[in-house]
A protein has these predicted regions:
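Acetyl-CoA-dependent GNAT
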Residues: 5, 9, 16-17, 24-93, ...
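Conserved acetyl-CoA-binding loop-helix of GNAT-fold acetyltransferases
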Residues: 103-116, 137-141
Length: 162
């Protein structure tokens, strides 16, 4: 296997037993932001817990049919994908990997899977990202275009070829 070859992955449905892992994953995606903002270390865990609970509740209430999937790689839980299949589009609500699994091709492979499904169904794919976040470059390379940017969030859409 070459160094550039993507690491294989698997998907499985998330269960209640995965909540601790999902919190740890969520916290890993916010650490740099909180450190850069000077957020006191002692308050981070509590703050992250509240934010994680708010995000989980929002997604569950607003997107009750969304699929919550745990990404596995090499026998370990590596991340999660939350995907809502609306009648007129696919919505990637969240895609996140633990730091040790980033930059290994897993996210790209997952996104390509979603795009292949959308292309087959002739549906667009939507997602939101923080403006300027590293993954935005990946989304653009895969054909996503920005349709809204409020300075904090960017909404991106991918459209299948006709």
């Amino acid at each position: 296997m070459s160094v550039d070859a993507p690491v294989s992955h698997r998907l499985r449905a998330a269960t209640r037993d995965d909540l601790e892992f999902q919190f740890r994953l969520y916290a890993s995606t916010r650490q740099e932001e909180l450190a850069a903002a000077g957020f006191p270390e002692a308050m981070r865990e509590s703050f992250l817990g509240m934010q994680f609970e708010a995000q989980t509740s929002h997604y569950s209430l607003c997107y009750p049919s969304a699929e919550w999937l745990i990404i596995g790689s090499g026998g370990e839980d590596a991340g999660r994908l939350i995907l809502d299949r609306a009648p007129d589009h696919l919505h990637i609500m969240d895609i996140a990997l633990l730091p040790g699994f980033r930059g290994r091709g897993i996210g790209t492979a997952l996104l390509r899977q979603v795009l292949a499904e959308a292309a087959e169904k002739q549906l667009p794919v939507r997602l939101f990202a923080f403006t300027g976040e590293r993954a935005t470059g990946l989304y653009r390379r895969l054909g996503f275009e920005s349709i809204m940017d409020d300075g904090i969030h960017t909404e991106l859409v991918w459209r299948p070829a006709k």
